[in-house]
């Protein structure tokens, strides 16, 4: 069972953005049209979430940060998808990901910066810190999936929480980072409105999910009546070929 503090506290209307499986998230409906800056840490080869978001919000700016997505990795991914599609005759649409990348990120609204997100600036490693990214930004929707590096930037997220309307974040290896998570949840003023297991990561030695996807919403967007003792999260299976994970929480 997961610790009690990890479960959702408020019930709000949610909309699914992005892929049906991995790469998609449930987010508060009311936040989408109010967002001025969509900032995403971690992109990979799936930007369906970002594309969906910009469909519903015609005016917000998008900046993504991912140092692993380069021209070389995109071309390599293209040939891998081509081989897979020809051999197994499945998912032919993935062949066009390379073209889709250039069409989407070379427009006037969407920018992909090849930087690694960290706590400090390190030019040699192309690492950029959150102060440089979030400073002077308002009405922020923040999405984070950076494979355990999220724990290095939690203090900076707290620093800019007043300007964040919504945070969607993947917490990896939660069993090893419960103290950090508990500290973050106590200091972070945004409230958890949805928690989902990521079944791609599997279970730990206590049969708890290793990774959770959490959606936080700013307090200004809900009422006291929205607080509920037990909330059933909206979730979709990340990996349809792996066993579904059901979340259960301790009472205290």
Where are these regions (language model features)?
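Generic detector of short, locally flexible boundary/turn motifs and exposed helical patches
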Residues: 1-7, 25-31, 131-138, 179-182
């Amino acid at each position: 069972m997961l610790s009690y503090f990890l479960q959702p506290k408020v019930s709000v209307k949610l909309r699914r953005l992005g892929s049906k499986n991995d790469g998609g998230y449930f987010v508060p409906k009311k936040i989408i049209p109010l967002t001025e800056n969509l900032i995403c840490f971690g992109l990979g080869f799936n930007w369906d979430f970002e594309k969906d978001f910009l469909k519903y919000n015609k005016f917000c700016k998008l900046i993504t940060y991912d140092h692993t997505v380069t021209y070389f990795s995109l071309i390599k991914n293209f040939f891998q998808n081509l081989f897979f599609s020809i051999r197994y005759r499945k998912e032919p649409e993935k062949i066009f990901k390379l073209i889709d990348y250039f069409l989407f990120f070379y427009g006037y609204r969407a920018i992909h910066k090849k930087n690694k997100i960290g706590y400090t600036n390190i030019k040699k490693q192309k690492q950029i810190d959150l102060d440089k990214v979030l400073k002077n930004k308002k009405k922020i929707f923040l999405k984070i999936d950076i494979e355990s590096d999220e724990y290095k930037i939690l203090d900076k997220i707290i620093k800019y929480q007043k300007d964040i309307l919504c945070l969607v974040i993947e917490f990896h290896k939660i069993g090893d980072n419960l103290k950090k998570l508990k500290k973050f949840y106590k200091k972070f003023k945004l409230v958890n409105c949805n928690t989902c297991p990521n079944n791609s990561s599997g279970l730990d030695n206590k049969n708890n999910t290793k990774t959770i996807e959490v959606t936080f919403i700013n307090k200004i967007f809900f009422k006291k009546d929205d607080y509920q003792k037990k909330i059933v999260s909206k979730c979709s299976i990340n990996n349809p070929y792996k066993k579904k994970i059901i979340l259960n929480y301790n009472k205290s």
